[in-house]
Every structure is written in structure tokens, then in C-alpha cells.
From Swiss-Prot:
Subunit structure, as described in the record: NDH-1 is composed of 14 different subunits. Subunits NuoA, H, J, K, L, M, N constitute the membrane sector of the complex.
Pfam families xref list: Fer4_7 (PF12838)
Superkingdom of this protein's organism: Bacteria
Record-annotated 4Fe-4S ferredoxin-type domain positions: 60-90, 100-129
Protein name as annotated: NADH-quinone oxidoreductase subunit I
Length: 169
């Protein structure tokens, strides 16, 4: 055997050996992971845990007696950096103010949570719902009725999250 053919033979043998060893290492890793518990969630059926501070779909809350919490102070409208909130209010016979129009443009909203922090009566909150995809842009213009409906649907989860989050405010 000549010197170059010997080198070629050794390189070929070494390359085959490394390929085989690496292949075996890959099989070992694959077998190891095959018998470990799975970390993937099957999303629509299983959902991962949400942080108590998660900011999702907006909702307007009511008091336990059914009265709206919003006192039309308009702090949320003023503090909103995206100018996504529009409020119109009128005074009632008893002297208190209530909203006649409360609109949120969810397309503009940046989910910063400033509206929730500014509200003195916890009327506007960002709930736990993150699945609110729509087919048209118009469906993302939330009016007062839609926001109140969200509040009724998610009230238990919202109250629990606010209770968990209370020490941090």
C-alpha cells in the first residue's frame, strides 16, 4: 500500500467510525426522550397556566347588586396611550354619573393595563381570555354591552385574579 492510499483508507475508516458513533449517540438520545414524560400541550384540549397578571380581553364589571361599577371618571380614557377608549357619560337623577357609551377599539389597544390600574373602582379589567379572534375588524370594536357581557362571563376568574394580585398593588 502506498502512503497516500493508506492515508485515504484511514480517513475513510475514521469518517465511517465517527458517522457510526454519532448515529448510535443519536439513537441513544432519541430512546432516552422517547420514554420521558411529554412536555407538549395539546392546545385546544389542554391549556397551560396563566399568570395572575396576564392581560387579555377587556371586561366591564358590575357590583354584586347588578349595578355597573363604572363611575364615568374617564381616567382610563385619559391614560390610554393608544387612545383606544372612548367614553360618553351623563348625570343621573341621584347626582351620580354613569356611562352612556363605553367603546374600546381592540385593534388600537396595546394591552398595557394602564386603564385597569387607573380605574378607582376596578370597573375596567383585562380578563383571562386570550382566545377572541374574529373574522372582521368591526368585531374588534367593543361597545359597552359587549364589555359588560365579558364581565359577566369572566367575573369569577377576574375576581380570583384580582384577589391574588392585591398584595402587589
Amino acid at each position: 500500500m502506498t502512503d497516500t492510499s493508506f492515508k485515504y483508507f484511514m480517513l475513510k475508516k475514521l469518517a465511517w467510525y465517527w458517522s457510526f458513533v454519532e448515529l448510535i449517540k443519536g439513537f441513544v438520545i432519541t430512546l432516552k426522550y422517547m420514554f420521558k414524560p411529554k412536555v407538549t400541550l395539546r392546545y385546544p384540549m389542554e391549556k397551560g397556566p396563566l399568570s395572575p397578571r396576564f392581560r387579555g380581553e377587556h371586561a366591564l364589571r358590575r357590583y354584586p347588586n347588578g349595578e355597573e361599577r363604572c363611575i364615568a371618571c374617564k381616567l382610563c380614557e385619559v391614560i390610554c396611550p393608544a387612545q383606544a377608549i372612548v367614553i360618553e357619560a351623563e348625570e343621573r337623577e341621584d347626582g351620580s354619573r354613569r356611562t352612556t357609551r363605553y367603546d374600546i377599539d381592540m385593534i388600537k389597544c396595546i394591552y398595557c393595563g394602564l386603564c385597569q390600574e387607573a380605574c378607582p373602582v376596578d370597573a375596567i379589567v383585562e380578563g383571562p381570555n386570550f382566545e377572541f379572534a374574529t373574522e372582521t375588524r368591526e368585531e374588534l370594536m367593543y361597545n359597552k354591552e359587549k364589555l359588560l357581557r365579558n364581565g359577566e362571563v369572566w367575573e369569577d376568574a377576574i375576581a380570583l385574579r384580582l384577589k391574588k394580585n392585591r398584595p402587589y398593588y
